[in-house]
Amino acid sequence: MPACISLCAIISALVAILLAIMSQRRCGGSEYTTTQDGRISFTQLSHPEYPCIIAGFNTLITSFNMIDWLLPLNEEYLIAKASANTGLAIFGREGDPWRSHLRQLLNAIKAEADLSPIGRFMSQQQLIKSLEQRARVTQLIDERPDILRVPLLRPLIITGMPRTGTTLLHNLLTLSGHPGVQHLTYAATLQPAAAASGPEHKLARTEVQQAVIFMGFMRPLFSAMHEMEAELPHEELHLQVRSAAANPWT
């Protein structure tokens, strides 16, 4: 037994070293080229290039057919996980169809999305975080029902097809300096129930910034198309994520 434990420890150490090396490399074909003047031309966005450590994770999970066991995507598991993380058990008011929306979304993910293991992991974590925030928003409204009576004065609504400049227009409006133009930060759209200042705000901002860093690791040039930081302005569409029936899930 001691010999086995020592061998397992050695193997684990070697795997850790290998993964550390692989994490510095990227697998797959080049997805972009850079010209001499620094301009970036994206060439293979349909077949993106990922860190080798991600490719290795996908291969490992797929080879051993462990995806359903390691990364469950069922409503009971997700709700229980979100409840355990928050200590809350109420996710919506009576008559709110959020649960049927969640069920339909999960069925669609399993039947249509054809996710890799890392894609399934990210979807699972996003769903859990979404449910956590849904529970926190529900609690906040129960404690402060006056929130629902705050009038929305002349909201500015931007609509358009993807890649037509809607984000740029939104960001431009946030820079206007006009006192009547309010906006949310990326951190606020992901964690709307968090306090606007103090330790809770700092924790929320840190968590969101860590998520931004992870996205940068996964997709190093994403910021060239869409700059994202925890405290930068962001479209409010992520507020709809908690309905499980909004644009970010499509």
Per-range role (PLM):
Residues G180-A188:
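Short beta-strand-centered segment that lines the nucleotide-binding/catalytic pocket of NTP-utilizing
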Residues A188-T250:
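PAPS-dependent sulfation machinery
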Residues P155-I158, G165, A244-T250:
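Well-ordered, non-transmembrane segments within structured domains
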Residues S123, L127, R154, T164-G165:
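Generic hydrophobic, aliphatic-rich segments that mediate packing or membrane embedding
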Residues I157-P179:
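Glycine-rich phosphate-binding P-loop
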